[in-house]
Amino acid sequence: VHSPWAYKFIRYVINEHYPYYKYKDLEELVYGLDRRTRKLCKLYFRLVNYLQPDFFLDFFPSSPCYRFYVTAACKKVSYHQINHEFSFDDVNDKEHLATKCCVAHIPLTNNYQDSVDYVLNNLSSDSVLVLEGIKKDKDTNLFWKKLIKDSRVGVTFDLYYCGIVFLKTNMTKQNYIV
């Protein structure tokens, strides 16, 4: 990795193994999670702690666990759970959504193509998209490969079980396989 920014992001956000200040409390609060879900919770905690976003859009969550980790990592974040086709009307602060930093979590299930397309067309360039299940099957893998090449996408990180997409297109387009 030649980019200092990408190196720091991989080292201190994606692969950080040092226990964060809230991990122990969160493990007691949110118990009974399988290993992969706990790993994702911690990743979302670190990502939100790093970005300090104004909004976190949680599309079709399989569990409420992400909410606890996200809100513990950033006190100012406005968490929104979306269980149906997304519309800006679902968010009280919709006028800020297109101009503020936002993290959108979308599992590649249900009608994910429309949700991803909507997010890419409407969120600010400071936003980040996290897609779960990018290597789940042939279709999701193909979708991920197309997304990497999409003109609305900047730097991407392939973590195998999920993909992190930065919408800042003024950065040199690069896909890091971590």
Residue ranges of model-derived segments:
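A short alpha-helical cap/connector motif
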Residues: 1-125, 135-178
